[in-house]
């Protein structure tokens, strides 16, 4: 695993990442942004398969505190995805010498991609968001409450510790933040009208954390709309539940950007 150093608020962080080279000249780099409990390793072989399917350079990194990346000194706050999209992601892209990427974000990573796209619309080529969140639904909170019960009653802590140096904190920061009263008002829809790049939004019809309204609102509120892919027999992780369909959709989307 590779590491790169970034600086945020006068503090240095070592960030782990993987980097698969391009095999087709002229294709934009793809940067993967993981879910709220994810990291580089939890993408499994999806980055490598995506590189093979698209011919693009594909990078994936673990945000601070996830995987083997250095943790933040403070607990996660309600605006943590804003911080990742506006501050950390730009620093990572600069450190890895990535320009005009296609962001590919899953769940929290999809929300971070939208925040970046709305904050810096001239700095990316396009975005693919899979099961993103733009606002909080009761379905989301129910799923997160169920996750807490599983955490407390199964061997999930041991399993998550295989992927994260600080697994207990990863879970607590995510779960506590989403279930806190202030987070009920979390909303990033105001970023959508500023997004001008091409968008592909993917969601499973059986998503256990959200309704399809989450991607419908992207098409409604962005100036140029978005391509929507709603997958049957698919939950909150499209790249796992419907891998072939997701790889094909992203490949076609990227090829059309040329």
Q: Where do the model's predicted regions map?
A:
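Active-site loop/oxyanion-hole signature of alpha/beta-hydrolase fold enzymes
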Residues: 60-101
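Acidic catalytic loop of the alpha/beta-hydrolase fold
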Residues: 206-210
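A short loop-to-beta-strand scaffold at the N-terminal edge of the catalytic core in hydrolase folds
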Residues: 10-21
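Catalytic histidine neighborhood in serine/cysteine hydrolases
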Residues: 220-236
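Short beta-strand/loop motif that positions the catalytic acidic residue
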Residues: 195, 201-203
């Amino acid at each position: 695993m590779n590491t790169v150093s970034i600086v945020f608020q006068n503090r240095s962080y070592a960030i782990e990442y993987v980097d698969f080279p391009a095999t087709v000249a002229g294709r934009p780099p793809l940067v993967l942004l993981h879910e709220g409990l994810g990291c580089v390793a939890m993408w499994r072989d999806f980055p490598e398969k995506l590189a093979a399917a698209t011919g693009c350079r594909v990078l994936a990194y673990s945000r601070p505190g996830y995987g083997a990346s250095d943790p933040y000194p403070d607990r996660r706050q309600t605006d943590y995805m804003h911080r990742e999209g506006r501050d950390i992601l730009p620093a990572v892209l600069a450190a890895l010498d990535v320009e005009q990427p296609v962001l590919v974000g899953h769940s929290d990573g999809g929300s971070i991609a939208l925040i970046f796209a709305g904050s810096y619309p001239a700095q990316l080529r396009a975005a693919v968001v899979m099961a993103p969140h733009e606002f909080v639904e009761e379905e989301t909170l129910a799923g997160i409450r169920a996750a807490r019960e599983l955490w407390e009653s199964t061997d999930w802590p041991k399993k998550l510790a295989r992927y994260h140096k600080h697994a207990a904190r990863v879970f607590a920061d995510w779960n506590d933040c989403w279930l806190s009263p202030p987070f009920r008002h979390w909303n990033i829809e105001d970023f959508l009208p500023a997004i001008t790049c091409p968008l592909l939004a993917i969601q499973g019809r059986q998503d256990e954390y959200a309704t399809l309204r989450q991607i419908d609102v992207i098409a409604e509120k962005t100036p140029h709309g978005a391509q929507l892919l709603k997958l049957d027999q698919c939950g909150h992780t499209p790249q796992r539940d419907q891998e072939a369909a997701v790889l094909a959709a992203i490949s076609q989307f990227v090829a059309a950007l040329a």
